[in-house]
Regions:
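Electrostatic cytochrome c docking/interface patches
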Residues: 27-64, 132-136
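Bacterial N-terminal signal peptides that target proteins for export
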Residues: 1-8
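Gly/Gly-Pro-rich "capping" loops immediately C-terminal to redox-active cysteine motifs
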Residues: 78-123, 132, 166-169
Length: 185
């Protein structure tokens, strides 16, 4: 950029900064109340911080899943048009020479939620804030614990009699935890 253009750009930036310096604040919006903030402050951390009270079993989760989730994810978490929820590390092994071709042909069969998510608490967090797709945040905390328990069972990470709550859920070891880079210790 020639020197004259640099000078003009510099003068323009200095003028724009000075012109805005004396302008009053815009003052849009209003402060959130604690109740409003609490509705949105629902992030669950890998260590279980911010998990709500409640509990849910695999058996309860199976019934809720069939009513609320199976239409999109399939009866067993592998048949639906939406993301695969259950299964192994994917249909295609890392050593499969045709892996790239198969992935392009069957993109939803690569990784299940149980194989790619590093923390069980992330499943709870996602289900609570985003599912079911047609009515996000409509499940109670007990229902979310139950659906999470069922999804973990579909992935053979917990037994058929498992009950998830704020103590049990963070203790579930996910297969991807060891192969993930995380900001959480």
């Amino acid at each position: 950029m020639p020197t004259l253009e640099r000078c003009l750009v510099g003068l323009l930036l200095a003028w724009a900064g000075a012109a805005g310096a004396g302008a009053p604040a815009v003052g849009l919006g209003e402060p959130l109340t604690q109740a409003q903030l609490a509705r949105h402050d629902i992030t669950v951390f890998p260590d279980g911080r911010n998990l709500p009270p409640g509990r849910g079993s695999v058996t309860e989760g199976r019934a809720i899943y069939r009513a609320q989730c199976a239409a999109c994810h399939g009866e067993k978490g592998i048949e639906g048009p939406a993301t695969r929820l259950a299964g192994s590390d994917g249909l295609f092994g890392w050593d499969d020479p045709l892996r790239i071709i198969r992935i392009k042909k069957y993109p939803l069969l690569i990784w299940s939620m149980g194989a790619r998510w590093p923390y069980a608490t992330s499943i709870f967090d996602y289900v609570r804030r985003a599912m079911p797709h047609t009515a996000p945040k409509s499940l109670s905390d007990d229902q979310v614990y139950a659906v999470t328990a069922y999804l973990l069972h579909l992935n053979e990470l917990v037994g058929a009699n498992a009950v998830m709550d704020r103590q049990a859920l963070p203790k579930v070891k996910m297969p991807a935890q060891g192969r993930s880079v995380s900001a959480w210790p």
